[in-house]
Amino acid sequence: MTDRIVPATLVFREDGTVVSPLYGDIYHSAAGALAQADHVFIRGNGLPERWRHERAFTIIETGFGTGCNFLATWAAWRADPSHCERLHFVSVEKHPFAREDLRRAAAHIVAYTTITTITPIAPLVDELANAWPALTPGVHRLEFDDGRVTLTLVFGDALDVLPNLALRAHAFYLDGFAPSKNADLWSPAIFKSLAKLADERATFATYTSSGAVKRALDEAGFAYRKVDGFAGKRAMLVGEFAPRWRVRRHEPPRAFSTDRRDAIVIGAGLAGCAVVERLAARGWHVTLIERRERIASEASGNPAGVFHPMIARDDNLAARLSRAGFLHALHRWRALERAGHAFSRSTHGLVQLATSDDEFERMRESIDALGVPAELASALSRDDARALLRTDVAHGGWLFAQGGSISPAALAAAQCAAAGDRLSRIVGVEIARLERGGDGRWRALDASGATIAQASVVVVANAADAARIAGLRHAPTQRVRGQLTLLPPGSAPAVPLPVIGDGYVVPLANGVTLTGATYEPDDTDATPREAGHRENLERLERLLPAFSANALDAGALAGRVGFRCVASDRLPLVGELGDEAAAAREAAALTGARLRDVPRATGLYGAFGYGSRGLVWAALGAELIAAQIDGEPWPLERELAEAIDPARFLVRALRHGRVA
């Protein structure tokens, strides 16, 4: 992976404090981690009083450690009857603990706390540990208390990851090992990165009062003052962001400004229904418009789809996005299930088989070189694959222990059910275009020009039609036909898990097997064809040699056709859309523009171009859009968000003088 994560080693000193053998320093004061968190960071930032005046409040912490600062803050938020509506806690950690080590460390600290004036913390430890993510580089978003508390963990070196975050912080917890033990975390570069994320009223607190830290704070635009430290420590620093000069070219993201929290989502497939659920969870009232008579009727209406991350030796953008999307989707799906919105999915893993011995060796080497955790993926020899799948295979491959298959339509229905009475549906109506009125509200119009719905925000999530409806000239997408084949009981090897490789095979209910799929660009025929079934049978024979393609009459098989929407660079288009008309007017000044310089179509967002990866990308894409609309911390690195920014094609056109 980009930089493999080296977990922290759990060691206790005789006095019960947790110590890092790597840095030779303690994680917390011997006088108590939770008491230290309360004195230094919570009260040092004027909490809980300050968050009472915000709808949402964002904290950044440098150094998650044992998690006690987060646990203490979460408990304080719970105990405050006037707390903010949503609390966002973002924490960077280079060496996170493994799940059970984190549980042991936090539970030990909580057991010996002397704080009795806040919400009991012991139950929160288990919630945190149970949700703890795989130790992979990048951003991991966890949700607690029905999504009102989010913990965004960023695993990696703070010097690298802080400049790659997109958020607006109200408070900073400057933690970490002592400056003498970990100088990088207190370097001027760190404070300059934090200054670019600070709200105008942001505060900070830290236990240290070293001269080097004070100089770095001052240079970055933070005003500081000394106050009494914790447990007899003479002094600590608190202060606020108060730059004496302009310190940043781009302001950190703000919430979309509107008095009416209503939105239109066009397209009721995986992309659209995921957006519906995420906006409704934040209190938005959503109108979902679908041209078919029911939701998930097009590509999302397939009997099953497979979900798994992508692994590449160079850990490229697509691989990082698929890993982030896969892990985020699992977290969201489990939350839906816990809330009583169950849907059909397999939970016993998925196997990806190599197409040659050389490819298997590359797959095995990639796992080792990238340091992929076994809970994410592991190498599977040919013999092991045979034993696991109970049938012959030509080569080994990967086991994705948390991968599997899912009913896309059932997932979409669960997401709509979770939205409850905040969702209104309009089906059987096709939107022809969008227009923004003088009042700033968007109107969705049909072919006759009649207004079907209006709202402050619109999200186009209707695949290949999205760019047309939004009036985008610089969003190159292609419609790709995919034909599936259904095999009757007993006609194919009865594999217990979904298998992918050159094609895929998914066991369905009642012994039926799903296999596919063809890949036919610009073919608009929606009728299953015998040639497509034959192609799928031949692909299945290569995947599972025990199957004979000639044993079945391709012309007698049932199947289904769906259409993928694929962008020219094979990445999705997710986020706020560019204002192409404004860009054309300013084209001369935008020839060297970056994405953050491009004018945007205020209140208009896209979620399309997911190709064959809708199950993996839709949940993360929806969370990104909801975060952008509400001005929350983004759930992935800015580099990845920019890779899928719908305006990326507009920027390329501007650079080549093709916008007029």
UniProtKB/Swiss-Prot annotation:
Listed EC numbers: 2.1.1.61, 1.5.-.-
UniProt-annotated location(s): Cytoplasm
Region of interest (tRNA (mnm(5)s(2)U34)-methyltransferase), ranges: 1-242
Gene Ontology molecular function, alphabetical: flavin adenine dinucleotide binding; oxidoreductase activity, acting on the CH-NH group of donors; tRNA (5-methylaminomethyl-2-thiouridylate)(34)-methyltransferase activity
Chief place of localization: cytoplasm
Reactions listed under catalytic activity: 5-aminomethyl-2-thiouridine(34) in tRNA + S-adenosyl-L-methionine = 5-methylaminomethyl-2-thiouridine(34) in tRNA + S-adenosyl-L-homocysteine + H(+)
Pfam families registered for this protein in UniProt: DAO, Methyltransf_30
A biological-process GO annotation: methylation
SUPFAM superfamilies, per database record: FAD-linked reductases, C-terminal domain (SSF54373), FAD/NAD(P)-binding domain (SSF51905)
Residue numbers spanned by region FAD-dependent cmnm(5)s(2)U34 oxidoreductase: 266-660
Keywords noted in UniProt: Cytoplasm, FAD, Flavoprotein, Methyltransferase, Multifunctional enzyme, Oxidoreductase, S-adenosyl-L-methionine, Transferase, tRNA processing
GO cellular component terms, semicolon-separated: cytoplasm
UniProt cofactor(s): FAD
Function: Catalyzes the last two steps in the biosynthesis of 5-methylaminomethyl-2-thiouridine (mnm(5)s(2)U) at the wobble position (U34) in tRNA. Catalyzes the FAD-dependent demodification of cmnm(5)s(2)U34 to nm(5)s(2)U34, followed by the transfer of a methyl group from S-adenosyl-L-methionine to nm(5)s(2)U34, to form mnm(5)s(2)U34.
Family listed: In the N-terminal section; belongs to the methyltransferase superfamily. tRNA (mnm(5)s(2)U34)-methyltransferase family. In the C-terminal section; belongs to the DAO family.
Protein's UniProt name: tRNA 5-methylaminomethyl-2-thiouridine biosynthesis bifunctional protein MnmC
